[in-house]
UniProtKB/Swiss-Prot annotation:
It comes from the Bacteria. This is DNA integrity scanning protein DisA. One of its GO terms (molecular function) is adenylate cyclase activity. The gene is disA. Signal peptide: none annotated. PROSITE patterns: DAC (PS51794). Participates in a DNA-damage check-point that is active prior to asymmetric division when DNA is damaged. DisA forms globular foci that rapidly scan along the chromosomes during sporulation, searching for lesions. When a lesion is present, DisA pauses at the lesion site. This triggers a cellular response that culminates in a temporary block in sporulation initiation. Residues 7-146 form the DAC domain. Gene3D superfamilies: 5' to 3' exonuclease, C-terminal subdomain, DNA integrity scanning linker region, DNA integrity scanning protein, DisA, N-terminal domain. Pfam families: DAC (PF02457), DisA-linker (PF10635). It catalyses: 2 ATP = 3',3'-c-di-AMP + 2 diphosphate.
Amino acid sequence: MAGPPGDDIFRATLAAVAPGTPFRDGLERILRGHTGALIVLGHDKVVEGLCTGGFELDVEFSATRLRELAKMDGAIVLSSDLQRIVRAAVHLVPDPTVPTEESGTRHRTAERVAKQAEFPVISVSQSMHIIALYVAGRRYVLDGSAAILSRANQALATLERYKLRLDEVAGTLSALEIEDLVTVRDAISVSQRLEMVRRIADEIEGYVVELGTDGRLLSLQLEELMAGVETERELTVRDYLPIGSKAGTPAQVLGELSAMSPTDLLDLTVLARVIGFSGGADILDRQISPRGYRMLAKVPRLPRMVVDRLVDHFGTLQKLLAAGVDDLQAVDGVGETRARAVREGLSRLAESSILERYV
């Protein structure tokens, strides 16, 4: 799920400066040359108004040119797509009233220009040997691939453990659905685990972006672990969202879940109310019935439109399980062949769910 607009800008900038890109190569050359730099990643009338002195270039970008220009005093201004070097050796004069928490002259200027011009700004520190990125109101120090990979691998190991636990609670829920013994606690526990897994995956996606070409294997592992998780999140909410709920549509509920604080996410009662369940302290022990979206999604080659029609017609999973081939054929778009496939698919799922729980 997409984050705030600031997060989109931040990730897009990280991708532009990731290892393997020409721009990152230029930054690494500046670091190895033990020089500093102040680079504005964008050019418009506002940026032009902050520039004094220097000279106009408007030449194609290259890592070597960036390195050579960084040897001179003054800032470098690039085009918004980072394809051209617009100006070099310029003196940036941002509004001194723009707040900044930095102390060094170069870093203070970088933060103020980033806030005033609303373009990302890079500050390469000669003394501290770091690359600082100022974008969307935040400061971020770019680490090397080794440090990022170490954090990413730790997060991936955590994701694997959480995914294993998610599979366990989801399997238990499926068995309880077949037996019609589901409580609010059972359903909410699955939604809780799905949201936890999504958040860890979102963090790893940030590492993948930051790693650039070095994050290919990490991206493949993440994709494998997260296969079907986003669909499961939606189907679980659609299965258990109370009729006439004040919580809103499934999409709105998923948005509310994404916005929950880590503390609230651990509280099943708070989570239940976000999904639309109301009541007192015994809310978690209330028995509920699923509509059947999760189970029908596991039937092979069953179009989503047909799934919606089946759920609208029967209302609950138990009625679906009790329906015969003739009953299923009464639904628009379900012929005899598809009705038999649904009937046999649900029967197999029911048997396997019970076996997994008790054997």
